[in-house]
């Protein structure tokens, strides 16, 4: 994970993080996302539509994959993304609420270099995109229960999780959350 990279080679990790952040900022601008909060290695962002959030996430993961393949250092940062659409409350310069919490749980559920989305996002993007999805069924993470899907960036990412099983997944990393909430997590 991110902490292990920092312990091993702080300078290379910061350099890699900055390069990934540049990619994220470029894509946030392209897809009209706005950052509402950052905490350590997390980012909370809002998007004007589910399609924008998902396309931003897919482009981000693809660009990070290309970057990691061409990078000569040992520091290959990987990310988990969770995208939800739900109610949030704006508190000062931050977004809080159940919509954010579920996006965080989706981020924790996502595979390394993967994207997990809620059913509400899935229902919006399926008719408007040509992406492939894997139905994970109803998942329970901490106190949240929700229907989740993986976006398959690569067919080898397909996995099966027990439905209605309690997952004890650490909330690793970053968040690109939105009203459409997309969470990006560092590994």
Regions found by a protein language model. Name each.
Residues 1, 89, 155-157:
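Active-site/binding-pocket entry motifs
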Residues 1-56, 63:
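Catalytic NTP-binding/metal-coordinating core of nucleotidyl cyclase/transferase enzymes
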Residues 12, 19, 23, 52, ...:
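Bimodal feature
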Residues 32-40, 120-127, 155-160:
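Noncatalytic linker/hinge segments flanking ATPase motor cores
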Residues 44-146, 150:
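Catalytic beta-strand-to-alpha-helix segment of the class III nucleotidyl cyclase homology domain
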Residues 151-186:
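Long, domain-scale regions corresponding to catalytic signaling modules most often appended to membrane systems
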């Amino acid at each position: 994970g991110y902490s292990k990279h920092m312990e091993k080679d702080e300078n290379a990790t910061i350099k890699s993080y900055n390069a990934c952040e540049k990619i994220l900022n470029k894509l946030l601008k392209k897809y009209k996302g706005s950052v509402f909060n950052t905490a350590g290695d997390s980012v909370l962002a809002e998007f004007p539509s589910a399609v924008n959030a998902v396309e931003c996430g897919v482009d981000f993961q693809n660009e990070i994959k290309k970057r990691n393949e061409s990078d000569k250092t040992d520091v290959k940062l990987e990310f988990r993304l969770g995208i939800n659409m739900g109610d949030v409350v704006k508190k000062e310069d931050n977004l809080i609420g159940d919509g954010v919490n579920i996006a965080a749980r989706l981020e924790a559920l996502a595979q390394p270099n993967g994207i997990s989305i809620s059913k509400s996002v899935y229902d919006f993007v399926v008719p408007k995109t040509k992406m492939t999805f894997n139905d994970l069924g109803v998942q329970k993470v901490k106190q949240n229960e929700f229907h989740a899907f993986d976006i398959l960036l690569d067919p080898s990412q397909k996995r099966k999780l027990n439905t209605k099983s309690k997952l004890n997944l650490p909330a690793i990393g970053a968040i690109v959350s939105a009203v459409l909430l997309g969470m990006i997590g560092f590994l």
